[in-house]
């Protein structure tokens, strides 16, 4: 994941998120563990799919257009390649992304 529009690139260069670890799993698949708090993230047609799983926290994390749906440990979110979304991250959270 190196493109500026990628979800990985947005988190790495355009947010307060901290990358804990990343691994190339082969066949165009990458996994990354992140932590974040007091931030916003905006994704616009990243060009790849992202499967996101909350590991810790995230109880107040939500999409700006869906303010009543929150994250929590074990919850899963799918971000399709051509989607657009804007996220509000208030309290500390830890999550894993699978990019493909």
Predicted regions span which residues?
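N-terminal regulatory/effector-sensing and dimerization cores
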Residues: 20-100
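N-terminal presequences and immediately downstream first alpha-helices
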Residues: 1-15, 40-50
């Amino acid at each position: 994941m190196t493109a500026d529009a990628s979800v990985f690139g947005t988190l790495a260069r355009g947010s307060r998120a901290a990358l804990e670890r990343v691994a190339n799993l082969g066949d165009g698949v990458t996994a990354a563990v992140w932590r974040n708090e007091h931030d916003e993230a905006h994704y616009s047609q990243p060009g790849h799919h992202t499967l996101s799983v909350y590991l810790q926290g995230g109880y107040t994390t939500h999409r700006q257009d869906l303010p009543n749906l929150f994250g929590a440990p074990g919850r899963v979110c799918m971000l399709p390649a051509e989607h657009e979304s804007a996220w509000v991250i208030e309290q500390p959270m830890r999550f894993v992304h699978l990019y493909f």
